[in-house]
Amino acid sequence: MKRGLWMVLFAGVTGCDSIMASEVEQELWNALEIRNYQFTYTVSCFCGFVGPNPALITVQNGAVTRVEYLRGLGGQGSYLTQGYPTVDSLFAIIDRVQARDPADLDVDFDDTYHFPRTIAVDYAKNAVDDEVTYTASGFKLLASPQ
């Protein structure tokens, strides 16, 4: 308990862009034990991301079970779930980005559920089109599947 309180206080002093803040937010998310939810996932980049974007992601029992296209650009229905994140996967994205030592990493966390709402990355300060932003919005809790 003391460790958790110390981490929250430390995160408040150092700001949410620190590694410690990400770890605190992940611990708070894990403590909620949320396994069933939906959210809208958007990737903004010049990286050739293929697939529904934005996509409505449904997670049941901690696994992506459905991905739906949200814009009418010819795509409809549901898609393969492989490659689309859960909230736990969003925290893993933060870990992978931090391991690459980017020029800038800005993460904004949800105040209620503590998931990463926005992960904005600039890998190289003076490079063009290397930035990527991952966004999770419209988070909604779902009932447990039968």
Region spans (language model):
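A short-motif feature that recognizes glycine-rich, charge-decorated loops
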Residues: A63-A103
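Bacterial signal peptide processing site
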Residues: C16-M20
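A short, Trp-centered hydrophobic/proline-enriched beta-strand micro-motif
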Residues: L32-S44
